[in-house]
Amino acid sequence: MVTGNMLWSGEDKAMVASVLGKEAFEYLMSGSVSAECSLMAIGNDQNLQNKLSDLVERPNAANFSWNYAIFWQISRSKSGELVLGWGDGCCREPKEAEEREVKKILNLRLDDEGQQRMRKRVLQKLHMLFGGTDEDNYAFGLDRVTDTEMFFLASMYFSFPRGEGGPGKCFGSGKYLWLSDALTSNLDYCARSFLAKSAGMQTIALIPTDVGVVELGSVRSIPESLELLQNIKSCFSSFLSLVRDKQAAGIAAVPEKNEGNNPRLSNSGAVTERTDGNPKIFGHDLNSGTHFREKLAVRKAEERPWDMYQNGNRMPFVNARNGLNPASWAQFSNVKLGKPVELYAPPTPGHNLMNGGREEFRLNNFQHQKPAARMQIDFTGATSRTIVSPAHNVESEHSDVEASCKEDRAGPVDEKRPRKRGRKPANGREEPLNHVEAERQRREKLNQRFYALRAVVPNISKMDKASLLGDAIAYITELQKKLRDMESERELRLGSTSRDAITSEDSPSSEIQIRGPDINIEAANDEVIVRVSCSLETHPLSRIIQIFKEAQINVVESKLSAGNGTVYHTFVIKSSGSEQLTKEKLLAAFSSESNSLRQLSPKLHKVILPSLF
């Protein structure tokens, strides 16, 4: 089977099916959306990553945060088909307490080296299948792929036409889905159910908005919360849908209910039950100056290298967060790709909004537009960028939207940059995700440290990291023991006298004043007698005298003579032991001294030994 310019053998198919699950593998291979068709998002919320990160990385008042958050965005394939494609996402690894909770229900398998190789191989094949190249294949740089990362990274390659898969069905019906027991339930909410269960996800929530579907997951079992659903829907809906929500809040105070008591969240983004004030999520005001609220602006849509159609014309789509209503699925489904298309707002009276009527933006050709009524944005040569401050009421917000869309200023033409085909992991980012890339770099740095440690440890029992750390600890302990032994031996060689001298020098209360040598000169007849006296500590032969004392040998007489450049010092000693024993004792004493004394000892022996025998 040739798919995506790759030949997949039966072994490759079995490997991919074992990692992704049979249903997910068949879904990707079924060709619901051609693997060779890149997707272009209709609208590009530049603040989307921050919103998803807050849901995952910032716990709420109850110290809860989701394990992953994905936004499935309305996208258009190269063939013009409208699908829900990967918009952006964020994930984190389960905490220790969360893992214990999952293990009670699901026996998590241990990832061996073979399983890791299979996961990396599957990610590489998926990357190539969807038009990627070896140069930008991030799977080659992954050290280890966890269950959560495998589920998250594999999800990037899925897309859902209307009515297919969990996100497609949810968006088509306008009804949310909340599963609190996904691990034990037999319901497969999506083709990715096998991957979600492998990652230990107990709670799965799919929340439709007017621009896509928000998918949330947690390894904890979370009860359904209507307030949380409304907050998330308000946060991820387009700006104009929030304006309509404020109008609807003054009319309908009771939420509309569907069959089965399941509150319906309409595709238009209207939430029928709202409280007074601005919508909030996790305590953040959506209409305040926080990062949840982006300034209203009209920007040039990003040009894609593949958006040239049969007649050479381009299909522009405006930013969903820039004040223009992103078209719903039904609005884009009947668009003909023959002529350039623009979005404009018909002159709708203000009372229509107050009566609950929906303000729609229609698709039409340029030749049918009236200059006074159209809201035109030229995506080919100029860009309009009018910034409007956040409004405080419905009337001012509506007027600000119209004003921002009518004022156009000429801008520089953006330089076209060639892009590689294939689906990027997120909107305009080369890395799969910031936190995934950071984790990969941390592991690479840790591995480099282990490689360096392995190079300096001489004896390695096993090649795994735990054994390497144990061997390194044993080696360091051995080196410390050798150091202590060498220090002890050095202290013994210094001798007890040196230690006593060092101790006396360190103690301020026992300072010894070392006197210089006393010189006495006497003249008698024709001779001059010179006597030099000094303390034993300062005498050059003090160590020899000390050796005699330690050997219990008395010095009877000492003679000094000089000749031929050599000084001879002769000692006449007396010992209580035998002559042979005295000789051996002196030889042993002199041999234990420093190198200088050992070099001097043979000469002394020649002087001393004849005096003994």
Swiss-Prot record:
Gene3D superfamilies: Helix-loop-helix DNA-binding domain (4.10.280.10). Residues 260-270, 495-512 have a biased composition (Polar residues). Its main location: nucleus. It holds the Pfam family HLH. Residues 430-443 are annotated as: Basic motif. Residues 256-285, 391-441, 490-513 are annotated as: Disordered. Signal peptide: none annotated. GO terms for biological process: defense response; regulation of defense response; regulation of DNA-templated transcription; regulation of jasmonic acid mediated signaling pathway. Residues 394-417, 427-441 have a biased composition (Basic and acidic residues). It comes from the Eukaryota. Interacts with MYC2 (via N-terminus). MTB1 competes with MED25 for binding to MYC2. Interacts (via N-terminus) with JAZ7. This is Transcription factor MTB1.
